[in-house]
Amino acid sequence: TEYADLAETGDWQQHFIEADVVVMLQAQIGGNNYQEFVRNNIDSTRNILNTVKDQNIPNLVHISSSVVESVSNDYYTNTKKEQEDMVLKSGISAPILRPTLMFGWFDRKHLGWLSRFMKKVPVFPIPGDGKYMRQPLYSADFCDIIISCIENNIQSGRYNISGHENIDYIDMIREIKKAINSKTLIVRIPYQLFYFLLWIWAFFDKNPPFTTQQLKALTASDEFEVIDWPNIFDVEYTSFSEAIDTTFNDPVYSKVILDF
């Protein structure tokens, strides 16, 4: 493992020498600083693509995001759209995978953070009525798709990798509560109040786990294309309930918590 800032050229590029494949996963997901999104989603991508070309690496797998087809207008969505466009214009053959909201082991954000927050508070707030449809994707299934792209030498195509079960946000929270045996009370609060509380939080936390932009994205009512990716990539689909149970109750890996 080497820690490096991919937005800057450096010693990390030596690891590309004689590489057979590059899986491009890096991304700035949350935060309130636009320049962090530019550096980690745009500048880093430019450096990686240039290095792939310089080393004549034959295979690239690009991890994009379902948000490139979202109605949202925020830092993450806009820079991920630009990132995907950079890959398409690079001339490098690569399958482009667009996962929806992911969850699984070692999740320091998203459902992982929500589960830990739920364990700490007596009341868990839900914005509005909580009926915001999600299409959560189990990260282990997505890993199998990436492996399939590498092993089967998939060279091109844009694939919308959506979870196959539509589930409202509030029901997703209830499933997490059930999986971790939480006693917290789930309470709906007005959207504007929830937004205001996040806005206040951002004044005291430079890297908040959930931002007002992410709240807008949550309530954007996006519904992404569902393709038959289990057959396309010859992988198995894990049901949401089974995946949630494995995520939070595995005797070994569910206890591993990464620093936020």
Residues of each region from the PLM?
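Conserved beta-loop-beta element that borders a ligand/cofactor-binding pocket
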Residues: D85-W105, S115
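Mid/C-terminal beta-alpha module of Rossmann-like enzyme folds, strongest
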Residues: C149-F210, F224-V226, I232-F260
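Conserved catalytic-site region of short-chain dehydrogenase/reductase
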Residues: G31, S66-N78, M102-R108
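Active-site beta-alpha turn of Rossmann-fold NAD(P)-dependent dehydrogenases/reductases
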Residues: Q26, V61-S65, R98-T100, S162
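Conserved catalytic Lys-bearing alpha helix of Rossmann-like short-chain dehydrogenase/reductases
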Residues: I42-I48, T79-V87
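Conserved loop-to-helix N-cap of the C-terminal "lid" that shapes the substrate pocket in Rossmann-like
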Residues: I96, W105, G130, Q135-C143, ...
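A conserved pocket-lining segment of Rossmann-fold NAD(P)-dependent short-chain dehydrogenase/reductase
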Residues: R116-L137, I145-N153, N160-S162
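NAD(P)H-binding glycine-rich loop region in Rossmannoid oxidoreductase-like domains
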Residues: A4-N47, T51-I57, S66-S70
